[in-house]
């Protein structure tokens, strides 16, 4: 078969017409130095602050320092095989993570990739890790409670939906335990939870996940993990990733709870990055913007109004407010709350729960110090019954602490003082609670009612715990309907007061403990 010249030229023209060229313009640069997870890149003229830079091997770095003749970027992941002279490209994208309901019940890394071996995740889209917090007009005041299930917290330091409540204390004082119990208590409340583990041992995180699974709480929880073995960049970014996942629910008119465990380790990771980028160090060698590091994160936890939710969902969700409640954790050194990072976070948050090692070692657990623990906005969110019954508890404890210090020096005390001391000791004993045993509002109310109305007067100190257990078992057995009513309404009136009094009178007359 022979082709003549016209056929050949026609064939060539046809092929040229069909040839599809897609031109891609990439701003390309060259790595000029690699050290400790930081790369310096020359030639990226148009790069943005916080932009993802594509590296060889399907990895990314984030541009943090934009200098005159080079860009300082932090590598997300392994960097040992990166070398001078390698080509890198701008992506034009800010770091985004997958968000959506598909993440519930899963364990993911900072980038939202599954690390639990349960297969891929079906997400509802992507969200930028850095987002601007809702404005003043878009917010609504906090007036609904988040029940932690702890008597001492829900009575004296109540937390509301959309609040930021700091959990602060030395190592091994029960900070994580309190946060995990708060997640377990949300099983049936409809609040979605996000647990962000920053710089922790992988074995510790595995234990937390196992406990959540045992108590059926993992199904409505997202666990975001940046372990101690991961790069400083991933530890620094983990809280922002978790926050973006929590905001998905907030912006759609739902309630979410996020725990940052802990922000001290995030600040240390950020300090490491900043020093390697040669930013000037400030107090305790932290960079100057370490306050902004935490404030821009914690301001994203808020209660947003129905108009904001309606506008965000383009009218799909109407008449619903959304909230993201944050429980950041800070570890102190030898109880020093006046150090740089603790004071920063105390000033950003709406209150703090201070856990003390001396109380913990004395067997008072949760080791909450009611003297310097405070909730600045949670009082408005407390249920009526808890508000009414918890008033005397804080006063009783404050008087007890004052008298206990005084009684060490006084040999003979009058009867009134002895009575107050005894009552304070019993209330302290009553507020003790085992881990993984959160209590409902009705159970807490019944116990607080007993303390408030003097039913502990003739109970021996050593038997307060067994008195409480027997009382709750009796109420569950004989008065389940009343407990259910209190849990549903949270109301307190003369009728409920009379019924609670009746339960306690009957219990003390007929039961033993």
Curated annotation (Swiss-Prot):
It is a peripheral membrane protein. GO terms for biological process: proton motive force-driven ATP synthesis. It is found in: Cell inner membrane. Coiled coil: none annotated. The keyword Ion transport applies. One of its GO terms (cellular component) is plasma membrane. PROSITE patterns: ATPASE_ALPHA_BETA. It comes from the Bacteria. F-type ATPases have 2 components, CF(1) - the catalytic core - and CF(0) - the membrane proton channel. CF(1) has five subunits: alpha(3), beta(3), gamma(1), delta(1), epsilon(1). CF(0) has three main subunits: a(1), b(2) and c(9-12). The alpha and beta chains form an alternating ring which encloses part of the gamma chain. CF(1) is attached to CF(0) by a central stalk formed by the gamma and epsilon chains, while a peripheral stalk is formed by the delta and b chains. HAMAP family: ATP_synth_alpha_bact. This is ATP synthase subunit alpha. The gene is atpA.
